[in-house]
């Protein structure tokens, strides 16, 4: 949600301006979330949390998931309907053969003009070239990416003194309505403590032939 609000309200640009004592607000106008349509693809734990946050902003929330959760207070619709109605689209699904490039030339064409897209899940959910084409066509109001499908060897590294060989990533950084961060959505003190704790618990369980938590069959 922080990324969506930043992209929508240009907070990062406002901060850069005020650091230089430029208090001009031209070009920083955003849009209200109230009563807008939020679309959530993937309703696992993180998707569910995002739905609750959207409801807090009094948004109309639509969801798509091949395995709907009947206990969740949200309206499930087809992917096509969600894409065609969402003013703000947030991706929260795992990367599988079925979800790879779920955002592509075809699905982008279904989206509303001026829609906002945020991906904090997996980079491979988005066809980067299709995204660039959509940005060039001014399809999006804004795009927030905490993940990128070719992030290996780039994200978590200091490449500030290097020539970036990834033309698509370099192109994405040129768009004024695109915000990219380096896969840091998980990076909080509490999350890192939880990861360490669960890793040690699983190591102990494996050593002692106990049941592993979150075992992937």
Predicted segments with their positions:
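Phosphate-binding beta-alpha-beta segment of Rossmann-like dinucleotide-binding domains, i.e.
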Residues: 1-37, 49-52
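Generic alpha-helical structural context detector
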Residues: 1-9, 16, 84, 91, ...
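Active-site beta-alpha turn of Rossmann-fold NAD(P)-dependent dehydrogenases/reductases
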Residues: 121
């Amino acid at each position: 949600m922080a990324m969506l609000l930043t992209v929508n309200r240009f907070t990062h640009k406002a901060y850069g301006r005020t650091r230089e004592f430029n208090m001009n607000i031209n070009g920083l106008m955003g849009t209200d979330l109230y009563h807008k349509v939020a679309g959530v693809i993937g309703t696992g734990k993180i998707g569910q949390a995002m739905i609750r946050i959207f409801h807090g902003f009094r948004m109309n929330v639509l969801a798509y998931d091949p395995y709907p959760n009947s206990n969740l207070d949200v309206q499930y619709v087809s992917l096509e309907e969600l894409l065609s109605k969402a003013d703000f689209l947030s991706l929260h699904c795992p990367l599988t053969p079925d979800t790879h490039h779920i955002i592509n030339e075809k699905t982008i064409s279904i989206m509303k003009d001026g829609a906002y897209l945020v991906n904090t899940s997996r980079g491979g959910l988005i066809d980067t070239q299709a995204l660039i084409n959509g940005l060039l066509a001014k399809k999006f109001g804004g795009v927030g990416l905490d993940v990128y499908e070719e992030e290996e060897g780039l994200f978590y590294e200091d490449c500030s003194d290097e020539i970036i060989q990834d033309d698509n990533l370099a192109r994405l950084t040129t768009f004024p309505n695109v915000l990219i961060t380096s896969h840091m959505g998980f990076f909080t003190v509490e999350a890192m403590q939880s990861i360490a704790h669960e890793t040690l618990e699983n190591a102990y369980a494996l050593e002692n032939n106990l049941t592993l938590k979150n075992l992937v069959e």
